Amino acid sequence: MRNLFLLILSFLVFSNVLAKDVDLINPCTNENILLDEVLSNKSILLNNRAISNQVEAFFISYLDQDGEACYKKKYDLFFKVNDSYIYNKELFNDLNNVYPEVSVSDNVFMIDFEYGNGQSNIERYYLTTSSGNIYLDKKDIIYSRSGKPNEIKFNNINIKDVEFSKLINIY
């Protein structure tokens, strides 16, 4: 009964977010992993962790049965805000040869993407936290072969609605 109530509540209110009832699925092993157990799971590699004002960002990679990098989906990112996890299943879809990194500066989370032949393009996304949510605020083209730096402002897009594969290299 409790699970049914939480399921209905998630469709009405939280849309992609539930603290303890959302699972990550390792695409190589098809293993369901509770978000509470991600950091201790043997098929998950913690690549990076960033902390700002009681909010934590975890950048992870999946491992296959042999402990090697999973190439079906290389990366995922989730946040821990007030003991609840915020996770978007579509966040890193179809980012094949992109190498992201998560950091924090002045209470702003930054995701850097390197991609292209010789990783010659770098894009940076700025995320802020407010009222228990994560918002995408702007994007900077840090370096590109065209040599044209560019800044794109977003209107506080909730991270639950972002799919970075649709934002990469759009300028």
Please tell me what each predicted stretch does.
Residues M1-D21:
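Classical Sec-dependent N-terminal signal peptides that target proteins to the secretory pathway
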Residues K20-S43:
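Short N-terminal segments immediately surrounding and downstream of signal-peptide cleavage
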Residues E37, R49-Y62, V104-E114:
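Acidic/hydrophobic-patterned starts of short beta strands in beta-sheet-rich repeat architectures
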